[in-house]
Every structure is written in structure tokens, then in C-alpha cells.
Swiss-Prot record:
Residues covered by region (Disordered): 1-68, 134-164, 203-353
Keywords (A to Z) from UniProt: Coiled coil, Differentiation, Nucleus, Spermatogenesis
Comp. bias intervals (Acidic residues): 275-347
Location (main, coarse): nucleus
Residue intervals passing through the bilayer: none
Localization of this protein: Nucleus
Biased composition (Polar residues): 255-271
Role played: Regulator of histone epigenetic modifications and chromatin compaction into the sperm head, required for histone-to-protamine (HTP) transition. HTP is a key event in which somatic histones are first replaced by testis-specific histone variants, then transition proteins (TNPs) are incorporated into the spermatid nucleus, and finally protamines (PRMs) replace the TNPs to promote chromatin condensation.
One Pfam match: CCER1
Composition-biased stretches (Basic and acidic residues): 1-11, 46-57
InterPro entries xrefs: CCER1, Coiled-coil_domain
Biased composition (Low complexity): 209-220
Record's protein name: Coiled-coil domain-containing glutamate-rich protein 1
Length: 400
């Protein structure tokens, strides 16, 4: 073929069947329809998508060309004389006719034979397939099948034993599962404040009951002698006089009573003790005069005993003075034991702080509080001493 179909594609008229010809001779493909004026480089399924629009290369790259009869493409140079099969399938050792006897170095290199042992035994641990022999320039990466795979998929268990996490110090899981009723861990500020306020409410309740009990005692001490005969009138007045210092002394000793709730609150919510006492008073009015007289006499004796104990306590306090607080505490305990169970409970309740008390008294220990100056007990002259003005402006001479 001396004439090309398209001169623009083959300007040198190199037509022919050579590998450098612009239009190699081949049979028409089944999908090809020859039209008048259509170029030979019509798009074919093996060529790229731009064959119609681009002129082919002047010297096309050499491909695997079939020879005079079909042969599979040749492998790379390093696999020419290896035992790898060409077309896949199971590996078969090459025919003995094509093998030359291997020297010891080749046997050691190919089959991993130990150089000190040249026998046919189990020490020939190399596989028949020398696939581990790589082309030059390649590196064997021991211990992994592929480049990116770190763990063999066939290995069902890890080589290293699992770490026991229970022996390690784990961080606190603040946002994990909690009990259904808990909004936060038990040691948070909210929980502590709830406890504090609950204690304060309980203390306020106890204090209210205690104040109501004191008021009822004072009321009972003033009313019950009035119901008695006219001969007992001066005695009832004396009991009222003794009850008044007793209440004053209680207020002096326990400042929490000064913050008791208003009487309107007490009247709104009377304690069960008050209700019981009112029922007792109704029963007393209904009972016989003789029984009433006996009860009144017994009550008067108890009140007299309490007032005498309180008078003795007041005298001892006046003699002791302000400096002996420990003795006062002991005397108070003795008096409370003698007064009975109600008075003992009352003293125990007095130990708690009410809501209105300043919390500054809780700051610091007793020893620390003693070191601070209490300005309530100092006069104006002690706080600001009268010093002559000449002494104020004197600068001490420190040169000598």
C-alpha cells in the first residue's frame, strides 16, 4: 500500500504495515461502517476517546505486537528464568531437562539451606517456590502482607495479651450512667447545699417548737395559780416574778431565742404540744375541785423547785463573773439534769444555730477568735488613747 488515505496524517507517505506507520493494516471491526470520506482513524473500542479529533503520534510508542503467530507478552527480565508460571494457575516445577545442577551457593540462596548442613533433610526449610526472591531494588517487608495492613486478617487473636484496665487509675466518668433519681454525682456543690438547707430547716423547726414550749410554760405558770383560791394570790405573783428572770436569763445565755419567729406564725401553726396542753386545761376545768386542787398544788411545788434552782444559779453566776465560762456551763448542765427531761431536751436544742444567726462566729477556732480584739468591751479611750499632740509629731532619733 503506497497511498495513504489521509495525507495530513501521513505527510511522508510512510504507508505500509510497519510498526511506525500511521494507519496500521487491520481488519474492519464489526461495528465499523465505511462511509465516503470517513477517515481510517475512525474511533475504535481499543483506542482512546480522542482518536477522531487528534492526529496520532509521529512515532507511536511500541506496544506488545503479535508476532508471526500469537504469543503471550514477554515478562520482565528478572522473571525470565524464574519458576513463576506465565499464565497463572497452580505452580509446577519446571522440567528437569531445562534445569542445570545448582551450586551450593545457589541452593543456599534459593532454598535457604544452612551452609553447615549439605544434606537432604528437614533443614531444607525453604519452599519449592522461590517467590521470596524479589526483583532487584525491592525490599522484603517482613511480617505484613500488604503495605497498609497492620494486622493479618487470618490472625484471630492478638499476639500481645490484653491490658487489664481495672489495675490502672481510670478518670472519673462524670457523664456516664447514673441512678435515675440523681441529677449529678453525690459530691457536687448542689447536693451539699441541699443538705445544709435541710439541716437549717430542721433547726428552725426545732427552735420554733422550743420557743412555743417556753411560752406555754410561762403561760401555764401565770394562769394555773389564778384558778386557785384567793389565799394563793400572793404566791402566784411571786411565781410570776420568778418566771420573768428565768426567761431573761435564758435569753441571755442562748441568743438564738431572740430570733424566734413572730407570735403570729406560732398562732398560725401551733405545735402538737400546745394542742395537747390546751386539751389538758379543758380537762382540768371539767374535773372535780379536789382533783384540781391536788394537781395545782403539785404544779406549784414543781414550779417552786425550778424557781429556787434558777435563783441559786443566778447568784452563782453573779459571783463567778464573766471570766469563768466553763463553770457556768457545768452549772447549766447540773440545773438541766435536775429540771427533768424537758429541760434537758431544751438545752440540747439550744446548741444548734438558727437561720438568723451570723455565720461569722463559725469562722476560725476558739484560739484564733481569742486573739482578735473585741471592740464591744473596749471604751472609747482605750480604742483611741488620749496622747498629747507634741508626742504624735515627735520623730524618734535612730542615729544612736
Amino acid at each position: 500500500m503506497t497511498q495513504t488515505v489521509n495525507e495530513r496524517e501521513d505527510p511522508l507517505n510512510l504507508g505500509g504495515g510497519g510498526w511506525a506507520s500511521s494507519i496500521p493494516l487491520r481488519t474492519w471491526p464489526s461495528y465499523h461502517r465505511r462511509q465516503r470520506g470517513a477517515p481510517m482513524s475512525k474511533r475504535r473500542y481499543r483506542d482512546g476517546p480522542k482518536t477522531e479529533y487528534e492526529a496520532p503520534r509521529k512515532q507511536p510508542k511500541q506496544q506488545h505486537i503479535p508476532g508471526p503467530w500469537f504469543q503471550p507478552p514477554r515478562g520482565p527480565y528478572w522473571a525470565l528464568y524464574s519458576n513463576w508460571g506465565r499464565c497463572g494457575g497452580p505452580w509446577r516445577p519446571p522440567l528437569v531437562a531445562f534445569q542445570s545442577p545448582l551450586c551450593p551457593a545457589q541452593m543456599i540462596r534459593a532454598y535457604g539451606l544452612h551452609p553447615l548442613c549439605v544434606c537432604c533433610c528437614s533443614c531444607w526449610n525453604g519452599p519449592w517456590n522461590p517467590g521470596w526472591e524479589r526483583p532487584p531494588g525491592r525490599k522484603k517487608r517482613w511480617g505484613r502482607r500488604g503495605r497498609g495492613l497492620r494486622r493479618h486478617p487470618r490472625r484471630s487473636f492478638p499476639r500481645n495479651p490484653p491490658i487489664d484496665l481495672s489495675k490502672m487509675l481510670r478518670p472519673v466518668n462524670l457523664y456516664g450512667w447514673r441512678a435515675p433519681g440523681m441529677r449529678a454525682p453525690r459530691n457536687t456543690t448542689q447536693f451539699i447545699m441541699n443538705q445544709v438547707y435541710e439541716d437549717m430547716r430542721q433547726q428552725e423547726k426545732l427552735e420554733r417548737q422550743q420557743a412555743a414550749l417556753r411560752a406555754h410554760q410561762a403561760q401555764a405558770g401565770g394562769i394555773s395559780p389564778g384558778d386557785s383560791t384567793t389565799n394563793d394570790a400572793p404566791q402566784s405573783g411571786a411565781e410570776e416574778d420568778s418566771q420573768l428572770p428565768e426567761d431573761l436569763y435564758g435569753f441571755m445565755q442562748d441568743p438564738s431565742l431572740t430570733f424566734s419567729p413572730a407570735p403570729g406564725q406560732q398562732n398560725q401553726s401551733p405545735t402538737p404540744g400546745l394542742v395537747e396542753e390546751e386539751e389538758k386545761n379543758v380537762d382540768d376545768d371539767e374535773c372535780d375541785e379536789e382533783v384540781c386542787d391536788e394537781k395545782e398544788e403539785s404544779e406549784e411545788e414543781e414550779v417552786d423547785g425550778e424557781s429556787e434552782d434558777e435563783d441559786v444559779d443566778e447568784e452563782e453566776v453573779e459571783e463567778a463573773g464573766n471570766g469563768e465560762e466553763r463553770e457556768e456551763d457545768q452549772e447549766e448542765e447540773d440545773v438541766s439534769e435536775e429540771a427533768g427531761l424537758e429541760e434537758g431536751e431544751q438545752r440540747e436544742e439550744d446548741k444548734f444555730l438558727p437561720l438568723g444567726m451570723p455565720l461569722s462566729i463559725l469562722v476560725g477556732d476558739e484560739e484564733e477568735r481569742e486573739n482578735f480584739m473585741n471592740y464591744d468591751y473596749l471604751s472609747q479611750e482605750q480604742i483611741i488613747p488620749n496622747v498629747p499632740e507634741a508626742d504624735l509629731f515627735m520623730v524618734p532619733d535612730i542615729s544612736h
